[in-house]
């Protein structure tokens, strides 16, 4: 198999550092890594009946469940031309089984996904990791059902470790009940229930009043336990803060840079985040909180 590099060179990806390539600053260096992925891949999927030719996706791990994916096309002479690449981190477990909508990006054969989860309160938009697998399945069965299991994960360029908010068991139990009731109200409101809408409005007003009073004397991070909200103008980037349920560290097999994998509970959603240890301020421990900006990725399971 032959391969050619990107026409006009290759751009640096801003989240390469999250998977242990923080010192990659030259295009020639990332081109070598891309060639390494194509030639010594861990996983390869080829779509031969693609409208534009033969589409191929190569993935290689450079750490624990994290690495680089390269996508492109073969020409009639079996020469592979990379179109784009991206760093990935595959999370653990199933984050949600809500209905997911997938749409192709305009400029290349990559995809974005959108999912409404009542626990977050906003539409989650993520970058689809397994584009080739999605293309395979959609060609097999036409329109895919909307309830595919979804695993979300995040790559972080920077983050901080915060102390936890002190809570007693009764307060935790009461908060879970309130969250459960609120999710039922949101579901009802989406179906046009006016009483549910009014109840949610009153709850929001009470919350605003409570925060307005406490913000005078308390720090905002002691009032807000966790959050998950859009960040900047790129639709798949989020500012998150959540409790650390588990963590582990490992090294990039090429650079030796230490990477930290954190399992977070954020607004009752559990997902994993990957960050270069040099970009994280503080020492992670179970029960503490992580606060940072993430690029949200998702993997659909078939």
Regions found by a protein language model. Give the residues of each.
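Short amphipathic beta-strand/extended segments with alternating polar/hydrophobic composition
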Residues: 124-126, 272-277
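Eukaryotic intrinsically disordered and solvent-exposed regulatory patches
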Residues: 229, 248-250, 278
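N-terminal ordered "arm"
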Residues: 4-85
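OB-fold (S1/OB) nucleic-acid-binding surfaces
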Residues: 245-273
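Short nucleic-acid-contacting surface segments enriched for D/E, G, S/T with interspersed K/R
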Residues: 277-292
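Long, hydrophobic alpha/beta structural blocks
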Residues: 49-232
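Short coil-to-beta-strand transition motifs
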Residues: 231-243, 288
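Short, Lys/Arg- and Gly-enriched loop/turn segments at beta-strand edges
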Residues: 295-302
């Amino acid at each position: 198999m032959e391969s050619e590099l990107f026409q006009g060179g290759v751009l640096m990806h801003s989240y390469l550092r999250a998977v242990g390539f923080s010192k990659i600053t030259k295009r020639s260096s990332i081109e070598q890594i891309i060639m390494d992925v194509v030639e010594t891949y861990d996983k390869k999927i080829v779509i031969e009946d693609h409208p534009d030719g033969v589409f191929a996706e190569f993935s290689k791990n450079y750490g624990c469940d994290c690495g680089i994916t390269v996508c492109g096309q073969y020409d009639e002479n079996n020469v592979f031309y990379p179109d784009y690449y991206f760093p990935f981190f595959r999370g653990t477990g199933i984050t949600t089984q809500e209905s997911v909508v997938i749409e192709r990006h305009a400029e290349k054969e990559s995809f974005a996904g959108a999912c409404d989860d009542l626990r977050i309160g906003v539409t989650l938009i993520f970058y689809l990791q397994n584009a080739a697998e999605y293309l395979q399945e959609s060609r097999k069965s036409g329109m895919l059902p909307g309830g595919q299991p979804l695993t979300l994960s995040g790559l972080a360029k920077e983050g901080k470790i915060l102390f936890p908010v002190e809570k007693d068991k009764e307060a935790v139990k009461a908060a879970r009940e309130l969250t459960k009731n609120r999710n039922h109200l949101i579901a009802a409101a989406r179906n046009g229930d006016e009483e549910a809408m009014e109840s949610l409005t009153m709850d929001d007003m009470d919350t605003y009043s409570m925060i307005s009073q406490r913000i005078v004397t308390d720090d905002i991070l002691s009032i807000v336990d966790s959050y998950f909200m859009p960040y900047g103008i790129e639709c798949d980037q989020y500012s998150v803060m959540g409790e650390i349920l588990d963590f582990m560290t490992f090294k990039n097999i090429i650079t030796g840079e230490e990477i930290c994998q954190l399992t977070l509970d954020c607004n009752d959603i559990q997902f994993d985040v990957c960050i270069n240890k040099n970009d994280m301020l503080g020492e992670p421990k179970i029960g503490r909180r992580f606060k940072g900006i993430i690029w949200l990725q998702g993997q659909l399971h078939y």
